[in-house]
Amino acid sequence: MSQQLTREEQERKYPNETWDLTTIFESDEAFEKALKEVESYLGKEEQFKGHLGDSAKTLYNALALEDEIGTQLEKVYVYAHLKQDQDTSNDKYTGFESRAHQLIIKISSAWSFLVPEILQIDEEKLESFIKSNDDLKRYAFDLKLINEKRPHILDADKEKLLT
């Protein structure tokens, strides 16, 4: 029976069978920096609460910010998750995954007002927002899907409780 290789031994013996995560982040330090950057977005959603129906521009700015945060958060989480999967015995990478997961929960909770508040906008007004703002047209399909959920979405407080 052969002896099981350690993670380092396996990486040395089979370098082509190891994920190259430098395409996501060059280093763990770059990951840490990106994680902090995403954390710095917490609280920026407050400027949009209660104002999504004010104008097409406000709605677009909220959706664009939430989209940007989501993109960065996904990158952070994928790196952390794959690092943990590389070596589940490494506490450092288990911590990375845990911190990234906790950040997902915080961001999701912070933005939980978004869909219920969009649904508070009258359907005709929402349609006029989309028609009047070329940037917002990028989110037309998403807004259509949200609108189809009108009968099934709770108010903002109840949605936050569920997240």
Regions found by a protein language model. Name each.
Residues 1-163:
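A well-structured
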